[in-house]
């Protein structure tokens, strides 16, 4: 689960990390008063969406102006006008795709005197099963670009969970960032607070980009991005309360309510599969035969008829879907349950696109019988390769 920048900074503030004072507004009329509560004389007006690259992005609407989603105001009146330009508009960045995201919140914060821009992040390294720090002197830009062009400017190391974090980890980060003197002590304290927050809040990723050195020599987190482990949200009610469902794909949101593992993609062939590995293989073979998957969807091993029905409805709600491939290898998941769910969904929402079904495993004959006697226009397949070829042919001709 992701949260907005203003929410991330509130968390940073709780854990003693240095951040600018700021206010969030949802109406342009509130912006002038919000900016007036801050010191000024420079205000930063930021669009709040769950995507990076806001400053380099652009708005679809001409009314929003030609600048990106991070703008500077030199008066409270200008802050109000900038908020008015951005609220309700669609911001497009390299992470949103051409669809973009609507801006429903604006964060106004005090400007900062920037001497240097640095990069600092914590993430779960799945290779080592540890929390890793990533630090670079090249802040204020995409870390992917730095990694590709100047990888030597990135320092990364993990923390042994048995011994935990020590001061030398903080000093290692400080030296990697080129800090000296009192800044090293600030960095050690910051690293301790960030690590404690990362562990206590069950985070998957915490990125501060940029972490700035101000002209007075102090450090400050100028931007923050946080991601949390969905599987741990049951014990993080305060984090769950920060969830902004308007920032999530409606189909992914609906899937989460039925415990379906769904990720929307850009292709034309919808997939319903049981098991993440088989789902990945299904997507790969669709691409192999010349088409693109419209989604990743794992219904899991203990799916019910209702769950399968909902999964099918989510797939068919995507206007880009031109065909559907159901690929089930029944172990715990019974093929007859899948068949009953498909039939129930088709009766409810109809079937306007080709449907290829490949069933194998537990109760496979019963599943095929149920589909065969349903009267549905279903294309049967014997194996995965056969199924992929048939759905691609049905869609592309």
Swiss-Prot record:
Pfam families in UniProt: ATP-grasp_2, Ligase_CoA
Chain residues that bind Mg(2+): 209, 223
Binding site for substrate: 274, 331-333
Domain ATP-grasp residue range list: 9-254
Binding site for ATP: 46, 53-55, 109, 112, 117
Record flagged with keyword Phosphoprotein: no
Gene3D superfamilies linked to this entry: ATP-grasp fold, A domain (3.30.1490.20), ATP-grasp fold, B domain (3.30.470.20), Succinyl-CoA synthetase domains (3.40.50.261)
Keyword hit for Ligase: yes
Gene Ontology CC: cytosol; succinate-CoA ligase complex
Disulfide topology: none
Reaction(s) catalysed (UniProt annotation): succinate + ATP + CoA = succinyl-CoA + ADP + phosphate; GTP + succinate + CoA = succinyl-CoA + GDP + phosphate
Cofactor(s) named in the record: Mg(2+)
Pathways involved: Carbohydrate metabolism; tricarboxylic acid cycle; succinate from succinyl-CoA (ligase route): step 1/1
An MF annotation (GO) of this entry: succinate-CoA ligase (ADP-forming) activity
Domain of life per record: Bacteria
Free-text cofactor note: Binds 1 Mg(2+) ion per subunit.
Keywords carried by this UniProt record: ATP-binding, Ligase, Magnesium, Metal-binding, Nucleotide-binding, Tricarboxylic acid cycle
EC number: 6.2.1.5
GO BP term (any one): tricarboxylic acid cycle
HAMAP family xref list: Succ_CoA_beta
Cited PANTHER family: SUCCINATE--COA LIGASE [GDP-FORMING] SUBUNIT BETA, MITOCHONDRIAL, SUCCINYL-COA SYNTHETASE BETA CHAIN
Entry similarity comment: Belongs to the succinate/malate CoA ligase beta subunit family.
Its biological purpose: Succinyl-CoA synthetase functions in the citric acid cycle (TCA), coupling the hydrolysis of succinyl-CoA to the synthesis of either ATP or GTP and thus represents the only step of substrate-level phosphorylation in the TCA. The beta subunit provides nucleotide specificity of the enzyme and binds the substrate succinate, while the binding sites for coenzyme A and phosphate are found in the alpha subunit.
Complex and partners: Heterotetramer of two alpha and two beta subunits.
Protein name: Succinate--CoA ligase [ADP-forming] subunit beta
Organism from which the protein derives: Paracoccus denitrificans (strain Pd 1222)
């Amino acid at each position: 689960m992701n949260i907005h920048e203003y929410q991330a900074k509130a968390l940073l503030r709780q854990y003693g990390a240095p951040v600018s004072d700021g206010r969030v507004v949802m109406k342009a009329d509130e912006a002038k008063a919000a900016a007036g509560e801050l010191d000024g004389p420079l205000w930063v007006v930021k669009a709040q969406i769950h995507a990076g690259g806001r400053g380099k992005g652009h708005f679809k609407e001409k009314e929003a102006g030609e600048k990106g989603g991070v703008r500077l105001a030199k008066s409270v009146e200008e802050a109000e006008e900038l908020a008015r330009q951005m609220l309700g508009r669609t911001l497009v960045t390299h992470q949103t795709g051409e669809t973009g995201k609507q801006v429903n919140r604006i964060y106004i914060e005090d400007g900062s005197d920037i001497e240097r821009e640095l990069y600092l992040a914590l993430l779960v390294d799945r290779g080592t099963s540890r929390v890793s720090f990533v630090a670079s002197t090249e802040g204020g830009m995409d870390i992917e670009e730095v990694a590709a062009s100047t990888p030597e400017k990135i320092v990364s190391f993990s923390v042994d969970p048995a011994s935990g974090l020590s001061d030398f980890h903080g000093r290692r980060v400080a030296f990697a960032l080129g800090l000296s003197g009192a800044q090293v002590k600030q960095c050690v304290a910051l690293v301790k607070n960030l690590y404690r927050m990362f562990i206590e809040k069950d985070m998957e990723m915490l990125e501060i980009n940029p972490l700035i050195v101000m002209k007075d020599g102090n450090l400050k987190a100028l931007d923050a991005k946080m991601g949390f482990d969905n599987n741990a949200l049951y014990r993080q009610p305060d984090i769950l309360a920060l969830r902004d469902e308007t920032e999530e794909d409606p189909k992914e949101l609906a899937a989460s309510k039925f415990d379906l593992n769904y990720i929307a993609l850009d292709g034309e062939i919808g997939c319903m599969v049981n098991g993440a590995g088989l789902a990945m293989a299904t997507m790969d073979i669709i691409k192999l035969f010349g088409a693109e998957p419209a989604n990743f969807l794992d219904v899991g091993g203990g799916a019910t008829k209702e769950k399968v029905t909902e999964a099918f409805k989510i797939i068919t709600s995507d206007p880009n879907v031109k065909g559907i491939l159901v690929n089930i290898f029944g172990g715990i998941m019974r093929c007859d349950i899948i068949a009953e769910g498909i039939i129930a969904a088709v009766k409810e929402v109809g079937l306007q696109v080709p449907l290829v079904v490949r069933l194998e495993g537990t109760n496979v004959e019963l599943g095929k019988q149920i589909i065969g006697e349903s009267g549905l226009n279903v294309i049967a397949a014997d194996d995965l390769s056969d199924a992929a070829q048939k759905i691609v042919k049905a869609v592309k001709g």
